[in-house]
Amino acid sequence: RSRSLRIRGVVTTLRLENQFWDILREIAEGEGLSTNQLITNLYEEVMDYRGEVLNFASFLRVSCTRYLAQRREIVAELSLVGQRAQA
């Protein structure tokens, strides 16, 4: 699915699979942002760090994957804490 948004005053179209849009929306909601605000913030962070963005859609996919991996780690840690509390 494609979505157009304005980054640094330029209308940009991003094409991502629906699952990635859903994950970005989830991340944005957790941060109290709109999806467009989150994407703009991520773009700004990449530009500040690297000075260029070669494949922003790919960067967003990797960001979503990392978010899911971190969430999985947190759930696993909480599960261990719960098991220890029951012992």
Question: Language-model segments: which ranges?
Answer:
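A detector of short terminal or domain-flanking linear segments
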Residues: R1-R8, A85
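C-terminal structural segments of small proteins and small subunits
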Residues: E52-S79
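Intrinsically disordered, low-complexity, charge-dense segments enriched in Lys/Arg
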Residues: L78-A87
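Amphipathic, hydrophobic secondary-structure cores in small proteins
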Residues: R6, V10-F59
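Sequence-pattern detector for short linear motifs
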Residues: S4-R6, N18, C64, I74
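Short, surface-exposed, polar/charged, turn-prone segments marking secondary-structure boundaries
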Residues: G32-S34, L42-Y43, T65-A69, G82-Q83
